[in-house]
Amino acid sequence: MNYFPWLTTVVILPIVGGSLIFLFPHKGNKVIKWYTICICLIDLLITSYVFCYHFELDDPLIQLTENYKWINFFDFYWSFGIDGLSLGPILLTGFITTLATLAAQPVTRESKLFYFLMLAMYSGQIGTFSSQDILLFFIMWEFELIPVYLLLSMWGGKKRLYSATKFILYTAGSSVFLLLGILGMSFYSSNEPTLNFESLTNQSYPVALEIIFYIGFLIAFAVKSPIIPLHTWLPDTHGEAHYSTCMLLAGILLKMGAYGLVRINMEFLSRAHSIFSPWLILLGSIQIIYAASTSLGQRNLKKRIAYSSVSHMGFLLLGIGSISDTGLNGAILQIISHGFIGAALFFLAGTSYDRLRLLYLDEMGGMAIPMPKIFTVFTILSMASLALPGMSGFVAELIVLLGIITSQKYLLITKILITFVTAIGMILTPIYSLSMLRQMFYGYKLFNTPNSYFFDSGPRELFISISILIPVISIGIYPDFIFSFSADKVEAILSNFL
């Protein structure tokens, strides 16, 4: 057995390394940037090493567990561990954060604080995905909100304070339900709190109480995912945030809500999930069509991409609600797939804004000729977003739909209706994606602003784009890489529903 605290190292390294940034000279933006990238790279390499040499793919149990008594008063442990459900989001977090740090090169105002906040956010996200104590999970969940709020409120558009305030009101408000659910579950059986994930998995509750807990957790995770009607903070936030922050929001933060739904609502509250799963299916179907239709009406480029993210999150609900092996594996694949695609689209939207200083699609046009590289990469990743065969988005959405069709829980007529409604959403997706490409890159040059700089993608931007494009295509061609570490865990979760 390996006793080295790998997961504690991965969680602590970014924030400890980030704290040293404030010791750097005041005028050293390049040094600070490359130092931050090195911290992210080292953390990602450690995570990759642990995955390659210390993680057993065919073991559905929690691995690399670390338990350190933190507070004796109520049996609170610093407890970490990973399994097939958390490994993918952890690797995704390291990868996207490293690229987002590289994408943040144009940020020069208060750069020390900016990069420290990115690293603090990194620690909070890794801590959330690897926590094996439900109170530690809550602490990491809340800790991560602080750097996000500061990144939103200090760097971005003119309405950044409004969007940051809206974000914190939604997320902090929903955290009240999360805390109440945690306290209720922990203190149900005795005066001694039960905080360990393994103990909570084996805990049973009266059905009525389990439903109450389920609703509380669902509200908390619905805000982060986001699920309609608790999604309205997302377009405003993406519309105002700096694009490196948007990469972290779309690539990682939204996945925390989906992870919570599977980890807590499905694994701990299986009876309540069986009751609510048809409603999740209905909500997911409505969300796919509603968000796709709303995206088509958005003039703001970043808001259009934000609504497309909301639409794609609807497939997660379908997979989670299907209660089938295929559907849940598809939902986990969608978490990873959309993490890459969403982050890439916001990065490319940001690079376009850096050149044009425009965000409204009806003010753009004819960008394909002066910027052919940006045009090519933007087109390919938009095709990935609309689920072109050979891309990760296609495989994820197809497997989710197969999960619905093969589910034993629903009648044939229900499956046909769900598939029909989802197909409408899949038709709307290319409409708003191709419309966006047409308005940006084709036609006559509509913009004529003195602050525009017509130069194509540089080496840094090409590197980031290609780095994200490679896994999108790789997963689309060989999705079994993701299933190799999620399949056994999915079987273990679904065994609670037999």
UniProtKB/Swiss-Prot annotation:
Provide the transmembrane region boundaries.
4-24, 31-51, 76-96, 113-130, 134-154, 167-187, 208-228, 242-262, 272-292, 305-325, 330-350, 386-406, 411-431, 463-483
Q: What is this protein called?
A: NAD(P)H-quinone oxidoreductase chain 4, chloroplastic
Spell out the family assignment given in the record's similarity comment.
Belongs to the complex I subunit 4 family.
Q: Which UniProt keywords apply?
A: Chloroplast, Membrane, NAD, NADP, Plastid, Plastoquinone, Quinone, Thylakoid, Translocase, Transmembrane, Transmembrane helix
Family annotation (InterPro entries): NADH_Q_OxRdtase_chain4 (IPR022997), NADH_Q_OxRdtase_chainM/4 (IPR010227), NADH_UbQ_OxRdtase (IPR003918), ND/Mrp_TM (IPR001750)
Any single Pfam family the record assigns to this protein: Proton_antipo_M
Q: Which GO terms describe its molecular function?
A: NADH dehydrogenase (ubiquinone) activity; ubiquinone binding
Q: How does it sit in the membrane?
A: Multi-pass membrane protein
Any keyword ATP-binding? no
Where is this protein found?
Plastid, Chloroplast thylakoid membrane
Q: Which HAMAP family match?
A: NDH1_NuoM
One Gene Ontology BP term is: ATP synthesis coupled electron transport
Give EC number(s), comma-separated: 7.1.1.-
Origin species, per record, is Glycine max (Soybean)
Q: What's one GO-annotated cellular component?
A: chloroplast thylakoid membrane
According to UniProt, the reaction catalysed is: a plastoquinone + NADH + (n+1) H(+)(in) = a plastoquinol + NAD(+) + n H(+)(out); a plastoquinone + NADPH + (n+1) H(+)(in) = a plastoquinol + NADP(+) + n H(+)(out)
The record, for NCBIfam families, names:
NDH_I_M
